[in-house]
Swiss-Prot record:
UniProt name for this protein: 4-hydroxyproline 2-epimerase
Enzyme class: isomerase
Binding site for substrate: G91, H92, H223, D249, G254, T255
Activity regulation comment: Inhibited by iodoacetate, iodoacetamide and by high amounts (10 mM) of pyrrole-2-carboxylic acid (PYC). Not inhibited by PYC at 1 mM.
Origin species: Brucella suis biovar 1 (strain 1330)
Amino acid sequence: MARHSFFCVDGHTCGNPVRLVAGGGPNLNGSTMMEKRAHFLAEYDWIRTGLMFEPRGHDMMSGSILYPPTRPDCDVAVLFIETSGCLPMCGHGTIGTVTMAIEQGLVTPKTPGKLNLDTPAGLVAIEYEQDGQYVERVRLTNVPAFLYAEGLEVECPDLGPIKVDVAYGGNFYAIVEPQENYTDMDDYSALQLIAWSPVLRQRLNEKYKFQHPELPDINRLSHILWTGKPKHPQAHARNAVFYGDKAIDRSPCGTGTSARMAQLAAKGKLKPGDEFIHESIIGSLFHGRVERAAEVAGRPAIVPSIAGWARMTGYNTIFIDDRDPFAHGFSVA
């Protein structure tokens, strides 16, 4: 029997939780972060479930573990953990991780105000604004994002046939826009969106294939992005992003905002240099920007950036005790 101890720094990014594991993370094998992610999932996924699920976490919990970089052009490597698994990339998680890592002295950037992250999805460039000991704002330049498919149709409970576009922004997103059987996210409750989303995701994954053309391990649709008209006077659009089994992102979602910008750019509604301010279900904002045009395996793409803020909420030393029947966590359906 053993008691495993993890020192965590807890916080949130624009309302969505981030738990940064600053001590106790396992040593991982692999020459890339994608390989280290695979090792973690094969042997240490109990750490993720123990720290993210109840009774130590909750349905919306999201986190990260810091590692030495696997590539010379990066300052630090990040493994993202949450209730839905180990995401290749997480935008809100990046903003929270960078904020807390800088404020707590866990990372020393080679160049003050800039940081290169080694993630399973690739290099993510960071610029941050610091006022004394506090990080006020983080802008991440994400991996290339692209529109993957248009007009895919499946049956949605209660609503009927629904058409979605699928875009990649670090994860694959099904984007649900207003149409005959769906009006606006504001016309439905969060509980309805949570009930419909896993069915929609499952049916899309069963009917269609989703495969990143350059990253073989990214091969499924993981998120549903419900769209709506903005309420905030600065915002261009509003969203509710579903992830995991029953979670709605409280932030505007960084990789989701990247995917949305890629979709809009592919349809001629955004161009390099344009800004896109995205509002979350609770009214917080991410400031997106199309940095430049790009290409992914011959597909037109964009390089998006996302800016947002995070706040630290406290320190947490968490035990995963083998004597505990719920050591590896649980989720109530």
